[in-house]
Amino acid sequence: MKTHILLARVLACAALVLVTPGYSSEKIPVTGSGFVAKDDSLRTFFDAMALQLKEPVIVSKMAARKKITGNFEFHDPNALLEKLSLQLGLIWYFDGQAIYIYDASEMRNAVVSLRNVSLNEFNNFLKRSGLYNKNYPLRGDNRKGTFYVSGPPVYVDMVVNAATMMDKQNDGIELGRQKIGVMRLNNTFVGDRTYNLRDQKMVIPGIATAIERLLQGEEQPLGNIVSSEPPAMPAFSANGEKGKAANYAGGMSLQEALKQNAAAGNIKIVAYPDTNSLLVKGTAEQVHFIEMLVKALDVAKRHVELSLWIVDLNKSDLERLGTSWSGSITIGDKLGVSLNQSSISTLDGSRFIAAVNALEEKKQATVVSRPVLLTQENVPAIFDNNRTFYTKLIGERNVALEHVTYGTMIRVLPRFSADGQIEMSLDIEDGNDKTPQSDTTTSVDALPEVGRTLISTIARVPHGKSLLVGGYTRDANTDTVQSIPFLGKLPLIGSLFRYSSKNKSNVVRVFMIEPKEIVDPLTPDASESVNNILKQSGAWSGDDKLQKWVRVYLDRGQEAIK
């Protein structure tokens, strides 16, 4: 009996062992910090990874269909994800809370435009918050605030939502049916800009003035909703036939009529220069209309550097250079340009100025002025070097003091063409005093004679070229006094060692303007450049004992002052 009982127990244990399922086929356990996969789905694999990393892993439906086999270690999850992405065609993103896995075919893209936040600020926000991923950079133009993003769907949605929230302005203040909106401008001025041009006061209207002028006369009641008058009632038929219905013109719906007249009515616009903002008061539709209008007008402008050269040359020297306004200019075998039949041309400015500098060393040319102006496209730049004389106007009972201003004035209004060339609206006024200096019989109250030369034109300059304007001739009288050193200053007899000479010549004045778009950051200032040169040459060494002593001495002086 005992033998039968023992045999039954042994058979029962053997049956239990045979029925119990094995973990090696259906549920492969995690061994240490790794995972052994055998034709498993990616969802199973990433569930095991989530268990080890203690981070949730979300796998899309398309990615979960793929199978994986192999022995994997989780000690470097980033490298493992990169390797799997290349081999299985996956894309992934980690936002600090969860890991998102997608199939490569699920990649999305979007184009976002920023108005109130620059692209650099938005990139810095993503980096500070830990949301930025170097595998999916934002590509765009910092000046215009428009960028392109491509990557996993969750990353693209996050970037678009974050950009929308950061760029979103205040919705305004609701006052019943009225609304007040605040619109901040980033690329233009909200108020008018005023500057003096000789005796004229020039005004460049701002955004507020431009919109007010646009809406002048729009304060009108709601227009007729029906597009035309209804037709007259048709006559009844005498024989009992049914008359046709009148063709009534289809009118607009009330909603369409209200939308069409939303821009009209009483809109209040105020410029606030402190923050360069525009305050708008009106209905919600009116405020939205002004907001869209401001968005279209407030665009970034490109910077333009204008280098001006005013050069006086002797007519004979200019002819020897080979300059002919109706032919060509040739300087050796380095410079050759063709000129049109007027007093304007484009040329390589650096080579022309090099030739002028060579003549200046021989005192055969004079660089009168060489200012450099920085402006923006569609913004005027003005250089004005003038002189003013005053004269009395005496009447029977009234006395007035009037003035006359003359000199050199250059006004340039640059803009960019579609092919990247710089087009300039150019106005030049060159005036000088033509009163003979040797005329000693002229009374004190006599008015001087002023000569003016005016040039007004529009020219387009290719990239890297300069604009040469002028070529007009004027007479120049120069008086030169030379003496023997020391002897020429002796009293009484000093005049014996001095001699004077008078020279009359024909001087040709030319204006060269070199426009250049500023794309890179501005160059460092002079002190920084000198310090860099000293460091590179070894003249500035941190091991120099004298410099260390001076630095310590100056630091002590600063501490004593504190």
Curated annotation (Swiss-Prot):
Gene Ontology MF terms: identical protein binding
Disruption phenotype: Insertion mutants are hypoinvasive in the HEp-2 cell assay.
Cross-referenced Pfam families: Secretin (PF00263), Secretin_N (PF03958), T3S_SPI-1_N0 (PF21304)
InterPro entries: Bact_Secretion_Sys_Channel, NolW-like, NolW-like_sf, T2SS/T3SS_dom, T2SS_GspD_CS, T3S_SPI-1_N0, T3SS_OM_pore_YscC
Provenance organism: Salmonella typhimurium (strain LT2 / SGSC1412 / ATCC 700720)
Record note on quaternary structure: The core secretion machinery of the T3SS is composed of approximately 20 different proteins, including cytoplasmic components, a base, an export apparatus and a needle. This subunit is part of the base, which anchors the injectisome in the bacterial cell envelope. Forms a stable homooligomeric complex. The complex is composed of 15 subunits.
GO biological process: protein secretion; protein secretion by the type III secretion system
Purpose: Component of the type III secretion system (T3SS), also called injectisome, which is used to inject bacterial effector proteins into eukaryotic host cells. Forms a ring-shaped multimeric structure with an apparent central pore in the outer membrane.
Identification of the protein by name: SPI-1 type 3 secretion system secretin
Main location: membrane
Protein family according to the UniProt entry: Belongs to the bacterial secretin family. T3SS SctC subfamily.
Organism superkingdom: Bacteria
Keywords assigned by UniProt, alphabetized: Cell outer membrane, Membrane, Protein transport, Signal, Translocation, Transport, Virulence
Annotated GO CC locations: cell outer membrane; type II protein secretion system complex; type III protein secretion system complex
Signal sequence annotation: 1-24
Subcellular location: Cell outer membrane
Record-linked NCBIfam families: type_III_yscC (TIGR02516)
